[in-house]
Regions:
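GAF sensory/regulatory domain recognition
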Residues: 48-79
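Regulatory sensory and allosteric helical modules in signal-transduction proteins
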Residues: 67-125
Length: 397
């Protein structure tokens, strides 16, 4: 029989040339481990942990077991502070970039980490943690466990070591593609990020779309900025946006940009969601945000008296790349956006929390909106009929 190091050579070749065809990273690890066990490696559990760039997630953990396949979990930043992580071999490997091995079948094995006792109780006889070195110097890690009596043989350890470098290359390519998606989603939004990642990056690349438009603003922000310490102001702004963004996303909207204390979002209209459905969803998101902000204003000392204004409109917008040279913005423009901006200012003058255009109400139906009157709007020749919520009057919030 061929030694394991020779048997896994075909697996290494697949990892280098064939793994890229798998659509999901967990599928790569599953097939890798299945190929290795078929080649004779006595694997009981394999783990790969790769750090990422994400505002809420420190990294992704892939755990393969022959009975469950590969299970993926996202690790929050709190993971780095947990004692179970701090007291693990992973920290040693991440800090030193060196492999770690404990042959747990050996009665004299050094049990210098709590996890080793847990592994031995599970019947693990050998445990290897190998660093995955990325080209930028970052160190991630993989772990390999067996229940084979006596642990891994020297040839099996050699076979595992031969996999580490190609596994690191595959993991890095997939990790950076995911990082690119994470960063684009974080800073330009999911739909816009997917468009950019798909290659829509030339200046002037735009698409005309139908959308409900959301433009909101914090009332009295200048006064708050003048009275609050800078960090308290930032914290308040974040909590203020926390009241809006989840509601927008849950109702099918896409946040395009933050403008100081302002927020621009769209609710795209397509074959699956028509005008009336989208406008009703945008209005419900507005109500949810209003209620959340009212609760924040009542409970937060710094947010006492916090006020919110929102304009809702519907129309055609140009969605795409606008800017200069190699500094572009993926946003939306057009007369419909301009009108939404004017209505948002009008809402402040009228003491209204939510103001909607006539076009929006035509598509939304009543929805609890009532006419307020016609008003002159800068930049538009005709006066605009505007609507407000029936359940609030002037200075409702």
């Amino acid at each position: 029989m061929k030694p394991p190091s020779l048997l896994v050579q075909s697996v290494v070749q697949w990892l280098v040339h064939g793994a890229r065809n798998a659509p999901l990273s967990q599928e790569v690890l599953t097939e890798l481990c299945e190929r290795l066990t078929a080649a004779g490696l006595p694997l009981w559990r394999v783990t790969v942990f790769v750090r990422t760039l994400h505002p809420e997630i420190v990294g992704r953990r892939f755990v393969w077991h022959p009975e469950t396949g590969t299970v993926v979990t996202d690790g929050s930043f709190e993971l780095l502070e947990r004692q179970s992580f701090l007291d693990s071999p992973m920290v040693h490997v991440s800090n030193t970039g060196e492999s770690f091995r404990r042959r747990l079948a050996d009665p004299d094995c050094v049990m210098d980490y709590p996890v080793l006792h847990d592994l031995r109780d599970e019947g693990v006889t050998d445990y290897v943690v190998a660093p995955l070195h990325f080209s930028g110097g970052e160190v991630h890690f993989s772990s390999w466990a067996t229940r084979q009596p006596g642990g891994f043989t020297d040839a099996e350890i050699e076979a595992i070591q031969s996999l580490i470098a190609p596994l690191a290359r595959v993991a890095e390519i997939r990790a950076w593609y995911r990082v690119a998606g994470n960063l684009l989603t974080t800073y330009v939004g999911k739909d816009a990020g997917e468009r950019v990642l798909a290659g829509h990056i030339r200046r002037g690349d735009t698409e005309a779309i139908h959308a409900a438009i959301w433009l909101s603003d914090m009332r009295g922000f200048t006064t708050l900025a003048d009275t609050l310490p800078p960090q308290d102001l930032v914290d308040l702004l974040n909590r203020y946006f926390d009241c809006q963004v989840p509601a927008i996303i849950e109702h099918g909207g896409e946040v395009l940009k933050y403008m100081g204390d302002g927020l621009l979002a769209i609710f795209p209209i397509g074959a699956e969601r028509d005008f009336s459905t989208i406008c009703a969803a945008a209005l419900e998101a507005g109500r949810a945000a209003r209620d959340q902000i009212a609760a924040l204003a009542a409970s937060d000392g710094n947010g006492s008296g916090l006020r919110f204004g929102l304009a809702l409109h519907v129309g055609d917008v140009l969605f795409g790349n606008i800017g200069s040279g190699n500094r572009l913005d993926f946003t939306c423009i057009g007369p419909a956006v301009n009108l939404a901006a004017r209505l948002e200012k009008l809402a402040g003058r009228l003491g209204r929390t939510i103001l909607a255009s006539e076009d929006f109400v035509d598509h939304c139906g009543d929805g609890g909106l009532q006419p307020i009157g016609r008003f002159a709007v800068a930049g538009f020749a005709a006066e605009q009929m505007v609507y407000g919520l029936a359940d609030e009057g002037k200075d409702a919030l």
